[in-house]
């Protein structure tokens, strides 16, 4: 199960969003990280059994986004 993001300027998986940010195809300041996190938490709450591998992947991607924001 892949978590997909739905934003005004992007729709797709989180790893693709990160790829576009790293290639400067999307501006990290245009990405509402708080909204992405809130939406993901809502999805996790709906899952009957949390797949920790998926949650771990999200945490890695979200952390990488935050680090990218700090280093810009």
Where are these regions (language model features)?
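Conserved small/polar residues in nucleotide/adenosyl-binding loops
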Residues: 70-72
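Conserved interaction-surface patches within small, structured recognition/assembly domains
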Residues: 1-9, 24, 29-32
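Peptidyl-prolyl cis-trans isomerase
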Residues: 14
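Glycine/small-residue-rich interface belts in oligomeric ring/scaffold proteins
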Residues: 28-67
């Amino acid at each position: 199960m892949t978590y997909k993001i739905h934003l005004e300027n992007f729709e797709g998986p989180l790893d693709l969003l990160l790829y576009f940010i790293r290639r400067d195809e999307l501006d990290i300041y245009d990405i509402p990280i708080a909204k992405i996190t809130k939406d993901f938490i809502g999805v996790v709450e709906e899952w009957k059994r949390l797949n920790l591998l998926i949650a771990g992947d999200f945490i890695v991607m979200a952390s990488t986004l935050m680090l990218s924001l700090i280093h810009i």
